[in-house]
Amino acid sequence: MGFSRTKIISNGGGTNPLGYTGAINLGPVEFNKINKAPKNGYIEDEVSFGNLINKELSDWYTYRTRTHNIESKNNVYLIKLNNNRFMKMRILNYYCGKKDQDCRTIMCSRQQAACLTVEYVLAKNGTDIFPISKFDSNASLTTESPLNIN
């Protein structure tokens, strides 16, 4: 997976012809209700107008024109990794140390931007079954959040 501010690519297809990583966007469903990954249907990266894009991952946020802030749609994504493992993930936040709702009415600074907080769970090795996530998305964001990508 590659992250660059709001752009996410999967390292499969147009990005890496030898990588078979792809994604499925399930929309804003309950994270822990997704307990099994399908074997097929994963969309890989493609080249579109000279840019790499994964159409399943490109629409993960809403841009707020009034505050100029990025707000996660809280979609759940299934990812098939190169090593035939499966992962489910959702982006919880775009701003370091702040919850999305803290940035809805005020402008969060550029220094706080592009510090994604991602909830993710890997399927048990050799299976397509996901264990239940122990992360509480209502908890305060700290350095102990599931995955902070700077």
Regions inferred by a protein language model and the residue ranges of each:
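Surface-exposed, beta-sheet-biased, low-hydrophobicity segments with strongly acidic/polar composition
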Residues: 1-150
